[in-house]
Amino acid sequence: MAIRLNHSVIPVSVKLGAPTRVSARSSLPFSVGDWRGVSTFSGARPLVLAKVKLRAESTEEDRVPIDDDDDSTDQLVDEEIVHFEERDFAGTACVPVYVMLPLGVIDMNSEVVEPEELLDQLRTLKSVNVDGVMVDCWWGIVESHTPQVYNWSGYKKLFQMIRELGLKIQVVMSFHECGGNVGDDVHIQIPEWVREIGQSNPDIYFTDSAGRRNTECLTWGIDKQRVLRGRTALEVYFDYMRSFRVEFDEFFEEKIIPEIEVGLGPCGELRYPSYPAQFGWKYPGIGEFQCYDKYLMNSLKEAAEVRGHSFWGRGPDNTETYNSTPHGTGFFRDGGDYDSYYGRFFLNWYSRVLIDHGDRVLAMANLAFEGTCIAAKLSGIHWWYKTASHAAELTAGFYNSSNRDGYGPIAAMFKKHDAALNFTCVELRTLDQHEDFPEALADPEGLVWQVLNAAWDASIPVASENALPCYDREGYNKILENAKPLTDPDGRHLSCFTYLRLNPTLMESQNFKEFERFLKRMHGEAVPDLGLAPGTQETNPE
């Protein structure tokens, strides 16, 4: 008997007892010779490979029982199995890789935090040919106390450090609060003077049906309302971006800053803050609509009157709570009100507000950064993707139910402004999600496929980043598959990838070796250990 793995035929001696069905979840407990066990790494799911000492012959004592739910069998493995299927990316297109710097790399006093340690880490990144880093420029730090008084001093010091090492800088215009979401390890609020306005006019914030105000970012209802000390939200965003462009002119002229990512909502993403942890949301809750501030409600009422049904100028009343399931609601269940005449009207309006906000802010960004590439981030709402309503996407503002394409119109808006689309969750596997949360009916792979193709069909650049920390080969291989699709007839690929994020765990020896290997493959370089498990090497039988 022989096993063919990664184009290599490996002889295996197997001694079987009674026929058996081996469960996919069954472990393979090898105890013969020099057992090394089933290889796992950094919390990833085990690869199906094992390493067993070579033997000239087997004895009855070497027989190893393999337990199964329904039956058992005896099996012998007489050869090392160290290969697994892994695609060779040598010679493929180079996809630049950037690394996000820590969220709190600049403190509230506009000083670089632990600059010597940071410099050492940046040198290490440069040594493995990372293309650059991503830096959040926080509105709450730079324009903290007084309108139109900007303090860029800490960022200037940081950018000079990065420039001296020959790294590029992706800059994020971060108009949102940091803190309270998954992965946030610092708390940076929006500017103090804006929060003072919010105390007397809380409708400047997104609001849910219970009247809870979300202070992560400003509601899109005030984009054109002069409620911020005589300025509209759009004017505030433009003035901030223009100040940055003037202050860092030399970095633009030297092409140190090749791209600006513009924050369009919570976490810098173009979405409603529909699943806030601060209000008790837990995965995989469907979230709630966030349109109950007076400005968005006035917009909804006006849209209903134009439609000729003024009684539609209200939010749905049967969507339940943040942690509900679609089938537990009258609105999102199969055949629910989401697909009624009113439901379609409401969802059209709700998603149009999102697209119009992106349209307006990206237009301002192109004015501020004329001649520089701009980008914006779209979140990967992959839970409940396998249901008809796609409830979690609907509450986030993506009208992507099973009978609609919710991402084509967004891609068309990006195309209008020649903006790149940055998408998350490219490292996630649908099978993993099904094993961990089968009730969520998630499909991150299907979502990534839909969004990437919507963007490519609109002829806009597509960048990406991982949604959760990733240190293992399996996650990196999934990113590579999405970055350079094997079956794409046009050879399309990501314009760049941004790794989340620089931290002590990444810098650990084995994790950094895996990252360096991933980086080479993203750059289209050959790696010597293709098809081998991490930490193993080819061995020759004696």
Curated annotation (Swiss-Prot):
Disruption phenotype annotation:
Normal growth rate and starch breakdown in leaves during the night.
Report if keyword Transit peptide is assigned. Answer: yes
Q: What is this protein called?
A: Beta-amylase 2, chloroplastic
Q: Name one GO molecular function term.
A: beta-amylase activity
Question: Which residues of this protein are catalytic?
Answer: 269, 465
- What gene name is given for the protein in this entry? BAM2
UniProt induction comment: Slightly by cold stress.
How does its record describe regulation of its activity? Redox regulation; active in reducing conditions, inactive in oxidizing conditions.
Cell location: Plastid, Chloroplast
Superkingdom of source: Eukaryota
Q: What is its EC number?
A: 3.2.1.2
Gene3D superfamilies in the record: Glycosidases (3.20.20.80)
Supply one GO BP term. Answer: polysaccharide catabolic process
